[in-house]
Amino acid sequence: VDSQIIDKTKLIYLTYPNNPTGSTATKEVFDEAIAKFKGTDTKIVHDFAYGAFGFDAKNPSILASENGKDVAIEIYSLSKGYNMSGFRVGFAVGNKDMIQALKKYQTHTNAGMFGALQDAAIYALNHYDDFLEEQSNVFKTRRDRFEAMLAKADLPFVHAKGGIYVWLETPPGYDSEQFEQFLVQEKSILVAPGKPFGENGNRYVRISLALDDQKLDEAAIRLTELAYLYE
């Protein structure tokens, strides 16, 4: 990144495991970011919403890096790891000045959350430490099985290191939106086209692993029937 741009940057927003790509970060990635911006006016926000899903290695926290709390906060969500999607329950920890600023902003933009949801979140955090690992193992098993079926049919995909999605490359002659429509009409499979996620996503569609094994297996079988499109 151009040094002049960095000099004017007030906030760096990181998210690992990344949504939408599923890429993960090592501790060295965070160490480098902290070293670069420590002592400057630039702060770092790390969105750790998919932190529970580290399939090939445990996902590091930016706050575990030396001086992490000097420049960063980390945002946690109960939506994915604790199956509380839609309830909008989460929290932030880290640099005290950033937390105070966030608290001041939230006071003027948020009227509060239904108390029962807060109680449920607190109970989950206090009593289900092993649940996140169980969740990760469930999705790892799904990923391994789904990707193995795609690989057996020589379908090109991006190996998912984290998150809950698999990216399938589109066949020649199809962009992401065209292939998404084809899958709906011909195979009754609903995926997300990659184009809305950025120009580089236009040759891919995103497939969610948040389905039971039987449905994922059936989706994989239907996809493998399209191997001829890639020839």
Where are these regions (language model features)?
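Hydrophobic residues in well-ordered beta-strands that form the structural core
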Residues: 13, 46, 191-193
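Conserved core segment of the aminotransferase class I/II
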Residues: 65, 69-140, 144, 148, ...
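PLP-dependent enzyme catalytic core of the Aspartate aminotransferase-like
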Residues: 2, 173, 182-191, 197-231
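Helix C-cap/helix->beta junction micro-motif
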Residues: 39-40, 153, 187, 230
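Conserved glycine-rich beta-strand-loop-beta hairpin in the small C-terminal domain of fold type I
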Residues: 122, 138-147, 157-169, 201
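A short linear hydrophobic-aromatic micro-motif
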Residues: 153-157, 190-195
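Active-site pre-lysine segment of PLP-dependent enzymes
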Residues: 1-8, 20-44, 48-84
